Amino acid sequence: MKRAEVLLTCDRTLMSNYHGNEFVGFGTCAPPNFIPEWFYSFLFFPPIKTSKGMPVAAPYGLRKVEAQLLKEGFSVVTVTPDHIKEHVNDAKIIGIHTMDPFGLGPASTTLAAMLKKEPYLAKYFQALLSSTAIKEAKKKGAKLIVGGPGAWQFQYRPRFVEENGIDCVVEGEAENIIGKLFRAVLNGEDMPRYYEASVKEAPSLGEVPDIVGPSINGLIEIGRGCCRGCEFCNVTLRPLRWYPYEKILREMSVNKAGGVNMCCLHAEDVMLYGSRNTVPDDAKLTRLHELVMKNCNSISWSHCSLAAVASNPKLFSRLSEIIRQKQAWWGAEIGIETGSPAIAKKIMPAKAHPFKAEEWPDVVKSGMGILHDNMMVPACTLIVGLPEEREEDVLKTMELVDDLKGCRSLIVPLFFVPLGRLKSRDWFRKAEMNKLHKQLLCQCAEHDFYWLDNLIDLAFAGKWYVRFLREFYRVFAGIAKQKTRQVEVDVLQ
């Protein structure tokens, strides 16, 4: 059994491959519901396979921390939450990766408000921190450090931090500071309760280590930062960097050696790989996909922008041809956010670039049509309750959703969460919803139900080993439709 001074882990909802489909992972944002918890967890976040308590794949962010600490000479072990006890005896530091620890993210907040329960991802994070293994390690003097994309939420839960003995919360890109913090702990030095890595501390391309263990579903970062500057987003505060092909292929080889033969290209806008502005680079993007497809069995994207797609339909079609040599479809998360040109101009003026912000609804319709024709299935987000939103803005968004009824997609409305340059603004809460907001939520639900059976067929086509799951998802979808329509009646009254 591997002993180490640093133990890394995360909660049960993050240590899963979601049956090889990232879309399925969105089920962790929902609260407990009409499906028994044991069966719901099997459907939406089955436990990752392990070898001696160590996961065969782990969240990419956790793998990056692991790689950086190993690079700096620490002894490190990454384990699943169910196997902490076997590995924790020698650990002086327990590092926990978080995504949405309190369910304060947009999707979780919206579902929790509508269903009036705490989401699974928050429930399992809190179960991890209250576990016997963690508490016993703390009694023996182990220090508890948390980080990851969900680190910002701890600022809103100071009492939780105190009561659960969290010694340090690390927010931001940590490569250049994590070793110093961990070394200080081992030397018995004081450390801050909260540490937010500044832009100056962000690593250069050469300072970001390659992962040394496989990432869940083959997720590979191809770049960091974003040039669009939307006011509601944290990522725009980071410098834009694109990784060279060689680095991406090296990390793919790590995944492949560990038995992970799929690849999810991760960036805030995959369509802008290699570009220094909002115009796609045809040559670099095409070459990237040719290289990646030679080295994996399937590909997906984490995010892309509709403006980049609409600005170069021929390039997108070419990428679709490359990708669909081995698969029928692929997916990505895409931010629509609003159908109002006025709101687009105020808080996300560059999101439509190289088009004008006033053209945003037309950009969305054009981009979504191109995605549909090329078998890209987007999970789209809308933001409900944006600052300075008026009734006419909500009506514009409703008109846009209606125009998208023929586009194969999921459209998910999310309550506004104060992040980025808008972090000083107030949260949007269910009590603030007006009649139009409620109608918009119901409209999105009906859009999603219309496409759900088709998406289930696509998601599990050709996968004999999960074919039986398709029928369970169909049953779940059918019951969810009935339950949601009951909620719709209550909401609209």
PLM regions with names:
Residues 2-32, 36-38, 74-78, 226, ...:
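Radical SAM enzyme core and accessory elements
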Residues 3-14, 200-236, 245, 249-257, ...:
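N-terminal pre-triad scaffold of radical SAM enzymes
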Residues 8, 253-378, 384-389:
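Conserved SAM/AdoMet-binding glycine-rich loop
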Residues 21-52, 101-128, 347-356, 433-446:
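A solvent-exposed, charged loop/short amphipathic helix patch at secondary-structure junctions
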Residues 44-72:
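Short, charged N-terminal beta->alpha structural module
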Residues 61, 77-208:
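Glycine-rich beta-alpha loop elements in corrinoid/cobalamin-binding modules
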Residues 94, 102-106, 264-277, 310, ...:
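Flexible glycine/acidic-rich beta-alpha junction loops that bind and position SAM and/or redox cofactors
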Residues 155-164, 315-319, 387-403:
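Catalytic cores of alpha/beta
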